[in-house]
Amino acid sequence: MGFKCGFVGLPNVGKSTLFNYLTKLNIPADNYPFCTIKSNVGIVPVLDNRLNKIAQVVCSNKIIPATIELVDIAGLVKGAYKGEGLGNQFLDHIRDTNVIMHIVRCFENRYVTHIYGSVDPVRDVQIINLELILSDIEVCKNRMCKLEINKLSHNKQVNKELLILKKCVYHLEKSKSLRSLNLTEEEIFVINYLRLITLKPVVYIFNISIDQSRNLYKREIFDIIKNEHNAKTVNVCLDLMQSSKNDVSAYDHLSLKYKQLFNKMLKNVIWAGFNALNLITFFTAGKKEVHAWTTTNNLFIFQSVKCIHTDLSKGFIRAQVISYDDFIKYKGEKRSKELGKIRIEGKRYVICDGDIIHVLYNV
């Protein structure tokens, strides 16, 4: 089960630099707009201290963490929805992601250029959000035109979708994202195939300076995003690396204090994306390996184990389940079983974060 986080923002705000440090890649991240043209993709581990503790209990030397896919998408500009700055191509890349990581520059630095000549985080957020909204309006209206042709057939499904799309367009034309529209699960299911961008969860990543006096960290930004449904925010400080042309080797020259600070920021970015997607982690554990698996919260166990192998989902019979806390407290399966802490669950069991499972199946 793959989950994609797309880095979105104006050109030259730090997307590629952040991508490099998270993925340990060295894609170009130079100080000029549209340095990135094609989207870059990298897989990053979701660091979880529970893995090491489980491995100690089962005496396993092999640990496999959960992962998230990151996509570094070229910068958007005004008019992107009409194709400005290769906008259509970039917007399609955003549609293919599961969560938007919106990077905003919030600091002054005369050595780092800005595509609009000045640093204004509020304006920059509004530019990107408006382009995404206009793109969704265009997608909805194009679909509505096609549906209108079939409207006379009195097809209930066609009329149902038309009503939902009209509701969406009305909301979008008030410059509001679809995240802030209270669509039902059924309504979302009907239009999900359109991959509407403003319906996706969002994380705002504020690229700040280590020198707080240079930060334009305006309260107005939060006034803009406060109505975003469950929008997450996180700070990063990428100007720590500017002196070395964004090469990942710049990290080696940081002091221990700044290394710890930078590592914490990177970890916060990954977990912000993880939480925005409403994901949880469950585990399989044995001497051969300890493996973390990622699934959407509130799924039945037979649905969740599909990420391990489709056969486990198709032929699911039952699962042996123990919570992480009990597994660690009682030092493994044997003592946990003696104390009645291991449960046998059927396919309608809703898997919980931290569950350690063993599945019985037959195909």
Curated annotation (Swiss-Prot):
Pfam families: MMR_HSR1, YchF-GTPase_C. GO terms for cellular component: cytoplasm. One of its GO terms (molecular function) is GTP binding. Mg(2+) binds at S16, T36. PROSITE patterns: G_OBG (PS51710), TGS (PS51880). Belongs to the TRAFAC class OBG-HflX-like GTPase superfamily. OBG GTPase family. YchF/OLA1 subfamily. PANTHER family: OBG GTPASE FAMILY, OBG-TYPE G DOMAIN-CONTAINING PROTEIN. This is Ribosome-binding ATPase YchF.
